[in-house]
Amino acid sequence: MREGKKRPFAINVWRWGLLILLLVLWEIGARLKWIDPFFFSSPLEIARTAVIKWQGGTLWRDIAYTGASTLLGFVLGTVIGSVVGLLFWFSRPVAQVAEPWMIVLNALPKLALAPVLVIWFGIGFLSKVILAFLMTVVVAAMSAYSGVRTADPALETLMVSLGARRMQIFTRLIVPSAMPSIITGLRVNIALAMAGSIVGEFIASDRGLGRMIVYAGTTFDLKLVWVGVTVLSILSVLMYASVVLLEKVLMRHWHGAVTE
């Protein structure tokens, strides 16, 4: 037991240790001119620039804008896609017709639609949410439908023989069977939603971390570019960690409901 508890702690120490070592080497390399400080800047200069932008009020507004569009697109895409995937159980012929189209839609380069969406819906918040939604909705539907197909046919037959209605079978067998697939798909979807939101900001936007990176690049402000990349990386890690935590809570609740 002690070895099992020490192992995650040791792994975390190594992770943070390697990150700190990388930052120290980066700072030393920039100061000693081993690397060009104009192109690569340095951790301390990036931190100073970030503080200035935060105090000016622009950085936190860009973080809030990108975070909100990502989360809204993620939630809408996951919920609507999961509901669609679950409802396919009520009509197998419809599901069989829709499945190849879902595969085709999932394979389409949806990020290529970003310029079209910006033209249709403008450079504001809505186009970013829609792009994040499109990135996630098909994946969520396919995850839910694959979970539906894992339901035990013998249990379904038994419930029918005992007089269970279709809605009872759906809520007590189909939905619980699909939940693990739906929950597992959350990790993939949060990354896709973030990618959709950022690409939308790259194309055209009045706010957001993506817009900040593009603006900094066009003005050759590479310190600000690194600020945007760093903050975006931190935001991505925080969102992913939150989804992993949510996944654990939902799985624990689901297992508890099944055992009851």
Model-identified regions with their sequence ranges:
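Short helix-to-coil transition segments within interhelical loops
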Residues: 108, 148-154, 158-178, 218
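Glycine-rich helix-loop "coupling/hinge" segments at transmembrane-helix boundaries
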Residues: 118-120, 195-232, 251-260
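Transmembrane-helix boundary motif in ABC transporter permease subunits
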Residues: 72-102
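Generic hydrophobic transmembrane alpha-helix motif, especially the helices
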Residues: 102-139, 146-147
